[in-house]
Amino acid sequence: MVSADATPKGQMTVLDALKGALRTALMHDGLARGLREASKALDRREAHMCVLNEACEEEAYKKLIVALCSEHKIPLIKVPDGKQLGEWAGLCVLDREGNARKVVNCSCVVVKNWGEESSERMMLLNYFQTEQ
């Protein structure tokens, strides 16, 4: 389990890398959003990474996701804001200028398919290896 607060100096932050990686995975239809989809993907071991909203009100949701991630040894990142996670996962409507409107709160997102090689993906993988 990894907290998203740590930031390597001189590089993009972990949250910036996470945002880019989620955007790439979303374009390649590689995200499972919400508790139901995420728990199924984690249980089937289809997940490469899991992102959990720390501010989730249901403690049972958090315990389930943390338990599935630790059981299957899937990296877990916690983010502080569910609205921000919902925006990164594509649970919003974009207006003409490209700004997010009507953002839906998201409790959990699982990356099933990274999409393509990217610097954000490599940074996250290096981050997971150094935090273990």
UniProtKB/Swiss-Prot annotation:
<comment type="similarity">
    <text>Belongs to the eukaryotic ribosomal protein eS12 family.</text>
</comment>
<dbReference type="GO" id="GO:0000028">
    <property type="term" value="P:ribosomal small subunit assembly"/>
</dbReference>
<dbReference type="InterPro" id="IPR004038">
    <property type="entry name" value="Ribosomal_eL8/eL30/eS12/Gad45"/>
</dbReference>
<dbReference type="Pfam" id="PF01248">
    <property type="entry name" value="Ribosomal_L7Ae"/>
</dbReference>
<dbReference type="GO" id="GO:0003735">
    <property type="term" value="F:structural constituent of ribosome"/>
</dbReference>
<keyword id="KW-0687">Ribonucleoprotein</keyword>
<dbReference type="GO" id="GO:0030490">
    <property type="term" value="P:maturation of SSU-rRNA"/>
</dbReference>
<protein>
    <recommendedName>
        <fullName>Small ribosomal subunit protein eS12</fullName>
    </recommendedName>
</protein>
<dbReference type="InterPro" id="IPR047860">
    <property type="entry name" value="Ribosomal_eS12_CS"/>
</dbReference>
<keyword id="KW-0689">Ribosomal protein</keyword>
<dbReference type="GO" id="GO:0022627">
    <property type="term" value="C:cytosolic small ribosomal subunit"/>
</dbReference>
<dbReference type="GO" id="GO:1990145">
    <property type="term" value="P:maintenance of translational fidelity"/>
</dbReference>
<dbReference type="InterPro" id="IPR000530">
    <property type="entry name" value="Ribosomal_eS12"/>
</dbReference>
<dbReference type="InterPro" id="IPR029064">
    <property type="entry name" value="Ribosomal_eL30-like_sf"/>
</dbReference>
